[in-house]
């Protein structure tokens, strides 16, 4: 299991040049990737970059509210973990940003079976997949890798905005009372 803390994020310009994103995971490395996890700074209204051939999930982490124009309607992301799922070639734009903030982006090649779960305080979730990411949005989040989630297993704590990434894994995610996390599971 790999833990990616915010200090290890790799900053890069958006594909369309309208902002900055911080890449956490690119799997496999290079182009074309199958999975990409990033955190984008949202500072002003701007169009989203197109990623044809991918499915995307976007969740507000902090700041906002942010209003997104999508499919002829406005979607307001006001609280942490408010989100939107869309295809990578959809025309999306942030049209209003009340306070600068950040969002979490999961991008997965369309051919891969994948799902995202928002996990809330006090929960325990058991997940298995070809690849799994757990992103700590808020509070205490622990990830336990291993089939038994017992004494010999690898238990890691995630700090705010930390991410656990593992491949071919079976994990348990344990959340403190006030915790909030997003989990991406690439099915086997």
Language-model segments: which ranges?
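Short acidic-glycine-tyrosine-enriched beta hairpin
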Residues: 5, 72-91, 119-127, 142-170
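An N-terminal amphipathic alpha-helical segment
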Residues: 115-117
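Glycine- and acidic-residue-biased ligand/ion/polar-headgroup-sensing regions
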Residues: 53-71, 128-148, 160
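Ligand-binding loop in jelly-roll beta-barrel domains
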Residues: 80-113, 167-188
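A short, N-terminal "cap"/entry segment at the start of jelly-roll beta-barrel domains
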Residues: 1-32, 48-50, 67-104
């Amino acid at each position: 299991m790999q833990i990616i803390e915010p200090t290890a994020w790799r900053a890069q310009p958006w594909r369309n040049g309208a902002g900055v994103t911080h890449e956490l995971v690119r799997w496999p490395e290079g182009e074309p990737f199958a999975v990409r996890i990033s955190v984008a700074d949202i500072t002003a209204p701007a169009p989203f970059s197109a990623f044809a051939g991918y499915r995307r999930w976007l969740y507000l982490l902090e700041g906002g509210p942010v209003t997104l124009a999508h499919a002829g309607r406005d979607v307001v992301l006001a609280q942490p973990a408010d989100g939107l799922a869309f295809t990578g070639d959809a025309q999306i734009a942030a049209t209003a940003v009340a306070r600068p903030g950040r969002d979490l982006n999961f991008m997965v090649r369309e051919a891969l079976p994948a799902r995202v779960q928002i996990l809330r305080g006090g929960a325990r979730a058991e997940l298995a997949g070809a690849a799994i990411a757990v992103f700590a949005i808020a509070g205490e989040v622990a990830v336990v890798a291993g089939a038994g989630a017992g004494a010999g297993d690898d238990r890691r704590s995630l700090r705010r905005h930390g991410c656990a990434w593992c491949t071919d894994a079976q994990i348990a995610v344990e959340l403190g009372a006030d915790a909030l996390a997003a989990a991406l599971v690439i099915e086997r």
